[in-house]
């Protein structure tokens, strides 16, 4: 009996692998395969758990019957996935009809096999119980878990105009966030140890700031899926204190600024200041919390400026959703006027396409573009004599520079746009996905559009082709109208 049981286990494993690879071949995406296979695996675990709770022995007949239920669960998962994909691909709502068919299929199986519960033989009763419990588990899992996972990772983001999650993207995100958390833990442990070291706090703060810079540089360096471009025409060395201002697009902005120098302190908002991971670190090195007002920190800022530190501020106050620069607040310019410091503008591009504010746990491909503009001396009155005038004029100056960068980088060769284009089609079937991939490659990423299509106008896309020209126009030339 033991040998036969082992053989059935072997058959179960082989059949599971065959089903998995058959689904993978059919869907063409490992993500859809896992979504279809997971309900079968969960229902199998539920069946085994219920058998253990109810004291039903796992004999030869039960193995065969459980495998039969496993196969039915496979069919149910495929039908549910077909309904979900149809709605995602074409908008047709066929899922409810699939659910109805699944319900009646499960109902007839339960009624047919459930009749054996009235049998007097214990083996027949166990067969009946396993059939009833197994089918209920399979139907509930197929009705709930699979649609929830599909909506969370694919349909939900797409309905908000965001790209769906991919397995590669999730792995990339987990690894980089894990690296970030390891760096935070290391710094927190180091700070705890430094409290015991009899050295001036300013010296310990310099060490921690240096390690923060190294950590930020390391994380950006290990983000291999992201291109980095650093422009520093003025050859800025951060040797003299300044008020550093930059447009705010993403969490990456903080890493970029802190990687430039170990002599940069930041003005932070509530969630950064109270973060359970790095809040204690930034408080130790004397970052500043905007919620408590600048006046409270003015003397500490003067002291830090004398030690050679610059102060970095995002004048917009919050991250942008669409990459467009918002209105500048005058706090940074008030500080520059009060502390008599130069203003150092820095333009950031592409960070919101890598980690979007609306989708913070999905790191995508793209470009981290950093351009350090020339310093604006404290006694330079060309931008106005007062902080209010300087706010408006420097804001216009930076927006003009940012618009120039957008014209230069918003092209079909931008890896962020290419990935966004492909991700519009990846879960709509292997034929559609590979047609689009090959089509885009044959068209050389539609580079011709960079010369032909104006910045503003109305574009008519004639022909079917799946619509990639319209998608790439929408991404690269947002001011054009598509029909």
Where are these regions (language model features)?
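Membrane-embedded transmembrane helical bundles of large multi-pass transporters/channels
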Residues: 1-169
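Conserved class I S-adenosyl-L-methionine
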Residues: 457-465
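Non-catalytic C-terminal accessory region of glycerolipid acyltransferases
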Residues: 171, 295-427
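Short beta-strand element of Class I
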Residues: 480-482
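Conserved SAM-binding loop of SAM-dependent methyltransferases across substrates and taxa
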Residues: 466-478
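A transmembrane-helix-recognition feature enriched in membrane-embedded lipid enzymes
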Residues: 166-227, 280-281, 428-437
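Catalytic core of membrane glycerolipid acyltransferases/transacylases, capturing the structured
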Residues: 191-210, 238-293
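Conserved alpha-helix/loop element of class I SAM-dependent methyltransferases that forms part
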Residues: 439-456
